Amino acid sequence: MKVSIDKFSKVPVYLQIADQIKSQIISGALPRGSALPSERALAQILDVHRNTVVKAYSELKSDAWIESRQGVGYIVAAANDENDAQDERGGEGAQPGRVNWVSEVAEKYLDMEKTFDDLFQRFTDESHYSLGSGVASREVYTSERVAGDIAALLTGSGPCQYFFSPYKGDKFLRQKLVAFLGTKGVKASSGEIQILSETNQALDFIVTLLVKPGDSVVMEEPVHPDMYRVMELAGAKILTVPVDENGMNCEVLESLLTQTRPRLIFVNSSYHDPTGNILSIERRKKIVELSNRYRVPIMEEDAASELVYDGDKLPPIKAFDTTGNVIYIYSFSLTFIPGLSLAFVTGNRDLIRALSYLVSVRLMASDWMTQKLLGMYLDDGIYYTSLLKFRDVYRTNRDLVCQKLDELAPLGVSYTKPRGGVYVWCRLPDGVDSKRFIRRAYNMGVTLIPGHVFYPCKNGGRDHIRINYSYESYERLGQGMDVLRKALEEELEE
């Protein structure tokens, strides 16, 4: 087993050790059942304190990569997940002559943090209360209403080519999005809009156009894991800027810009995921000023700016863009029919032209039904009236979650009440590790997201959890928060 450490890295040493051992397990370099060096032996080899190795092994053990046996020590676990278990029983991985896909697939696509993905996907599991997923409420667009409108689209007049959308996106929808952007103070033509299925796809395509391996990219910290993973897969070096109650710290940002020339500045401007904070109007203007001064593009991601409960709605950064430096990505993931995903990008015409070309190469067709449905709802006003209902549902849910969290204050829980959006960034009592706590909570029936996954270097967030209040009904949300309380009480008793 080969492990090397960089004591000058932002990644904690124990995580460097754990990540390298995990990579070797995934690649097959450390087969199942392989013995690992003792804590003391590995500490001596790496010239680190024994407690550092203890933390690394604990990390791997908690994720079921390794196990400890009395009289034997630490060994690679027999099965890490359902697929590994299938291989142990003689599944396809055990058949002679079969390609070893683990070794064939590029390592960067294998060695990924699974915690966020696993918990996010479990929101459909009705046996658990989902306080982890960022999915729209099911209470606004009823299934009967949607089914009727889809049937009307399918049986309406027009030839069958209406079942396809041009790669740039449905023309009628793009025209309606021009008006939608106008309500946000953003001027754009339909030719400056590219329709895509979701934020992740938009980000992936834009990064493909602009970022080369070795480039630096500035991102907020904490930040949604999907955002920084796209950057990492592109080979970018991530430079992080801390977020406070007013959003991205512009003093730190300016300091970075004076030292390096990043390819992009990524900003989640409104009701930031995971903190729920909103970028102040002063900082929005300052970031545009810095972008112009240092000629660095801004990528602004927005899914929650319409979800305002307290105070005024702020214009996006894009509204202050006079040079075309801002690429604006808007997602309807929190304000439309759950499961029907749609986003769009607006920016400089040359960039959008290049983006459209990339879309035409990678996608044969786009989602016709969702585009037609959203275009119709924007046109007849249903989207805007439904938006008011989303605000009411989410505001009520937010107040319930905050009430439940206030009751946990004597236990040491703290948070800042968000003025909009769908997330509460909750600090756990001293000594409670979020990764360990969310496993206990899950076993008791509630899903949460641990804070460390929002830190690219995994060097923060171990004392935080993200709570989402958009998906569950008011009743189930309250029940889920009660389970969270019981889980926390048990955690503190140990």
Task: Give the role of each language-model region.
Residues E301:
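Glycine-centered flexible beta-alpha turn that most often forms the glycine-rich phosphate-binding loop
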Residues M1-A151, S360-S366, L388, L400, ...:
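N-terminal basic, amphipathic alpha-helical segments
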Residues D392-C402, S414-R427:
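Conserved glycine-rich beta-strand-loop-beta hairpin in the small C-terminal domain of fold type I
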Residues T322-D392:
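Conserved core segment of the aminotransferase class I/II
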Residues T155-Y294, E306-L307, D312-F320, Y394, ...:
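Conserved core of the PLP fold type I
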Residues E67-R69, A188, L448:
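Short beta-strand "wing" residues that participate in macromolecule-binding interfaces
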Residues Y442-R466:
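Conserved PLP cofactor-binding pocket of PLP-dependent enzymes
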